[in-house]
Amino acid sequence: IRELIKEGGEWQRFVPYDFEGCKPSFTRQAGREMLFKLCTASREDFLALPDCDEHLANRFMSVVSSCPETMDIFEQRIKSKNITMARVRRMILHLVLGIRKDDIRQVPYGRILAFNRTGTRILAQAENRTLEYDTSLKKLEDISDYAKRVAFLEKNAVRLRETAAYGRCVSNEYTRKITIT
């Protein structure tokens, strides 16, 4: 599907609902912003990342000091036989979004972004659930301090996606409408 989107192909038939008005985006489109964040990060910032150790933090700092011109160059310089590209990209996204080791815990809530009739029935029958579900980000972030932190990170992810797609933030997660299919 990603390749179809990149090439301008017919990808819509492979997704469950209409994405009208929602421009597809890829992290590459925010490459300059991401590279800036990487090049201004400290060793401590890298050490705070999930899945980062002393060796990787040193490797990141070494690449930062070489002033790579693009994200592709940055990633290639980090990647090695023992460090996969997927891991490198995940760590970069964690840094850009502000996700730290202590953020990776139990899921604090389930946010409903879209549903159909079947989903409506399932939610109505789920009386003894242990996880809070809602469509309102405001209600969900009021569950706990940790839920508020996760909601903040969720908003960061939306801002990154919108910056990549539109060059700026265009929506408010507190007023976002859910999709009913």
Residue ranges: model-predicted function:
Residues 2-181:
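Active-site cores that bind ATP or allylic diphosphates and position pyrophosphate for catalysis
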